[in-house]
Amino acid sequence: YEKFAQMLLNGGKCGDARILSRKAVDLISHNIITAEQAKTFNWDSCIGYGYGGLMRTLINPEITTVGSTGEYGWDGWTGNYFCNDPENNLTFMYFIQVCGGNGIRPLRTLKQVMYSALDD
């Protein structure tokens, strides 16, 4: 999973091998929904986000707890969560296997800790 995330941060390349085109990475990691569509994209984990071809994309960091514009990723039904932050060149991954889980609260706390550790 880490190699997949790094490949996306590298614009579709893993080492010297091209896995996805730059265009494909841009399609899945940049917002493509309209402001009107975004009004229905209002789950707790998606406040401030739009949606790309496959992933949520942070478009309004002022209304979420922490993150950089352009952060993208996805989460799963059993509580797994992944995001890439191209601005800071970092990946955040959280893996659990609990249907329903604890929701977004522990993720927000962990992301706040991660971002507070970054040097300006």
Specify the residue positions occupied by each region the protein language model found.
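Catalytic loop of the DD-peptidase/beta-lactamase superfamily, centered on the K-T-G motif
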Residues: 1-120
